[in-house]
Amino acid sequence: STPIKSSAASDVYKRQMEIWESAVLNTHDFLKEEDFLYYKEQLPVYFQHVTLFGFEQEGILVGFMGIAKGNLEMLFIDNNYRGIGIGKKLITYAIDNLQVTKVDVNEQNNQAVGFYKHIGFNTYKRSDLDGEGKEYPILHMRL
């Protein structure tokens, strides 16, 4: 059976929050403290607008992604499990099974930009501000 499962946020919400925090603290070092706290507070709202899929290893949720209308809206891997191919498995599943063709990435998150380029995404547009109007430039990428 696949380690990728559709999951309602409420079932594993606490664990998703832990994963988000672990991932963001280790990949988004450009975030101001108050913005980190703002996004953390907004997570429940973001979760309501996506279909969530989790990746389990030995029964433990170690990563998840959120999909909406062909867009990969979020992909977070617990920092202890990064670099072993889980993100690639999730995004491959999304492309092959969920018709995902687009992703928006923080330009300052070099690891993520490199990851998506490696998968085959290319930047087609850039925004100076993120979706919340904050000064974190976004690269709009597509396959």
Write out the residue ranges for each language-model feature.
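Single conserved hydrophobic/aromatic residue that forms the stacking wall/gate
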Residues: S1-A9, Y13
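Conserved GNAT-fold acetyl-CoA-binding loop/helix
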Residues: E21-P44
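A short helix-loop-beta-strand connector motif used in the catalytic cores of GNAT acetyltransferases and
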Residues: Q42-G54, N71
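Conserved beta-hairpin
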Residues: T51-G63
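A short, internal acetyl-CoA/4′-phosphopantetheine-binding micro-motif in the GNAT/acyltransferase core
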Residues: N71-R82, V105-N106
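Conserved acetyl-CoA-binding loop-helix of GNAT-fold acetyltransferases
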Residues: G83-D96, G114-H118
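Conserved GNAT acetyl-CoA-binding A-motif
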Residues: D96-Q108
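Conserved acetyl-CoA-binding loop of GNAT-fold acetyltransferases
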Residues: K117-R126
